[in-house]
Swiss-Prot record:
UniProt-listed InterPro entries: P_Ac_Bu_trans, Phos_Acetyltrans/Butyryltrans, PTA_PTB
Organism ancestry: Bacteria, Pseudomonadati, Pseudomonadota, Alphaproteobacteria, Rickettsiales
Enzyme Commission number(s) of this protein: 2.3.1.8
Gene behind this protein: pta
Stated name of the protein: Phosphate acetyltransferase
Predominant cellular place of this UniProt entry's protein: cytoplasm
Pathway: Metabolic intermediate biosynthesis; acetyl-CoA biosynthesis; acetyl-CoA from acetate: step 2/2
GO cellular component terms listed in the entry, alphabetical order: cytoplasm
Subcellular location field: Cytoplasm
Family: Belongs to the phosphate acetyltransferase and butyryltransferase family.
Superkingdom of origin organism: Bacteria
Keywords: Acyltransferase, Cytoplasm, Transferase
Source organism: Rickettsia prowazekii (strain Madrid E)
GO biological process, one term: acetyl-CoA biosynthetic process
C-alpha cells in the first residue's frame, strides 16, 4: 500500500504526489475558482517539461521558506538540480524548520547575499550552471552582479524581464514585458525587450504565430503621448525586419489588445486585437502595476524570467508562492534546452 501523504499547499501538488508515488489528499473544499482555471495553463507547461533532464541551477541566498522550498520543489519535479549558495548555517536552519533534507543538494557557503550573487554569476560564466535562481535578496542586488561590466553575464542584447501570465478570462498564457528590470527604456531598449519576449514565446507556444501588442493609453499616434510614438516605431521596425518572427502592432490600449469586441467597437482593425501573446508596456511602473493588478485582483497565475543574459535568470517576487517559482524554473529549462538543441554539436554543454 502506498504511503498516504497530504500535499495541498499549491496547485501543482496533485502532480507531485503522482511523481513521488504518494496518495494525494485534496483540501476539504475544492472550488473551480478563476485561479484554478488559470493554473491549468501552467500545469500543461509543467507536463510538457516532463522528460527533460534537470538543469543545474545556482540558487542565490535561499534563506527563507519560499525560496528554499521553491528550489526543492522544482528539484522534486526533476526540473532543476539546485546548487544552494548562501550562508550555510542559515540555509541549514531554514531547511531544518521546514523538514528539508539537504543531503542530496550541494551547498556553497557565502557569508552575504552579494557574495552569493557573485559566486552564482561565476558559476554561470564557467558554464557550471545553466541558470540562476533568485532567493531571498533584492532584485537589484542580484542583477548588479549579472550586468557587471567586467565579470557579468551581458550579451549583445539588452537584458529584460518577462512575466508569463495566465488568467481565467483569457484563453491562453501571455507575456507582460518589461515590468521588473528596465525602468524607462529607450526605443532601442524596447526593440530588444520585444525580441527577447518573442523568442521566449516561440519556445512556449506550439502554435508558432506570435502576436505582439505595444501598449499605450490610446490607439492613435500623438506627440502628446510619447509612448505612442515608440509603439508606432516598433510596429514599423517589425515591418522592416528589425524585429523578427512576430506580428507587432501598436499603439494599442489595453482593452483593444485583449478584446476583439473593444477593438471593433472603436473601429480598430488589427491582427493582434483580442489575440495578443505579448503585451509590451511603456515602462516598468505601468507594467509592474498591471501584472500585480492581474495577480491580486484577477487571480492571475504568473511566472518570471530574465532574458538576454548568458543564462536564464529565474526572477520572482519575494511574495510569490512556491508553485510560481516552480513554473519559472520550467521556463528556464525550456530556454536552456532550446539553446542546447540549436548548439547540439557544441562541446560546451554542461549537462
Amino acid at each position: 500500500m502506498k504511503k498516504q501523504h497530504i500535499i495541498n499547499e499549491t496547485f501543482l501538488d496533485e502532480i507531485l504526489a503522482q511523481k513521488l508515488g504518494t496518495t494525494y489528499i485534496p483540501p476539504t473544499e475544492i472550488k473551480d475558482s478563476d485561479f484554478d482555471k488559470a493554473a491549468k495553463h501552467f500545469i500543461n507547461l509543467l507536463l510538457r517539461a516532463d522528460g527533460l533532464k534537470p538543469i543545474k541551477t545556482a540558487v542565490v541566498h535561499p534563506i527563507d521558506k519560499e525560496s528554499l522550498l521553491g528550489a526543492v520543489r522544482a528539484a522534486q519535479f526533476n526540473v532543476i538540480k539546485p546548487i544552494l549558495i548562501g550562508p550555510q548555517h542559515k540555509i541549514e536552519s531554514v531547511a531544518k524548520v521546514n523538514d528539508v533534507d539537504l543531503e542530496n543538494y550541494q551547498v556553497i557557503n557565502a557569508e552575504h547575499s552579494h557574495e552569493a550573487a557573485k559566486k552564482a554569476v561565476e558559476l554561470a560564466k564557467k558554464r557550471e550552471v545553466a541558470a540562476i535562481m533568485k532567493g531571498a535578496l533584492h532584485t537589484d542586488e542580484l542583477m548588479s552582479a549579472v550586468v557587471y561590466k567586467e565579470n557579468g553575464l551581458r550579451t549583445e542584447r539588452r537584458i529584460s524581464h518577462a512575466f508569463l501570465m495566465a488568467v481565467a478570462t483569457f484563453p491562453k498564457p501571455f507575456i507582460i514585458t518589461d515590468a521588473a528590470i528596465n525602468i524607462r527604456p529607450t526605443l532601442e531598449d524596447k526593440r530588444d525587450i520585444v525580441q527577447n519576449a518573442i523568442d521566449l514565446m516561440h519556445i512556449i507556444k506550439e502554435d508558432k504565430q506570435v502576436r505582439v501588442a505595444v501598449l499605450s493609453a490610446v490607439e492613435t499616434v500623438t506627440s502628446a503621448i510619447p509612448t505612442t510614438l515608440d509603439a508606432a516605431a516598433l510596429s514599423k521596425m517589425a515591418d522592416r525586419g528589425q524585429i523578427t518572427n512576430a506580428v507587432v502592432d501598436g499603439p494599442l490600449a489595453f482593452d483593444n489588445a485583449i478584446s476583439l469586441f473593444a477593438a471593433e467597437a472603436k473601429g480598430i482593425s488589427s491582427p493582434v486585437s483580442g489575440n495578443a501573446d505579448i503585451l509590451v508596456v511603456p515602462d516598468l511602473e505601468s507594467g509592474n502595476m498591471l501584472a500585480k493588478q492581474l495577480k491580486y485582483l484577477g487571480q492571475a497565475v504568473m511566472a518570471g524570467i530574465v532574458l538576454g543574459a548568458r543564462v536564464p535568470i529565474i526572477l520572482t517576487s519575494r511574495a510569490d508562492p512556491i508553485d510560481m517559482r516552480v513554473i519559472s524554473c520550467v521556463l528556464a529549462s525550456f530556454i536552456y534546452n532550446q539553446t542546447k538543441a540549436k548548439l547540439h554539436n557544441s562541446s560546451k554543454s554542461i549537462i
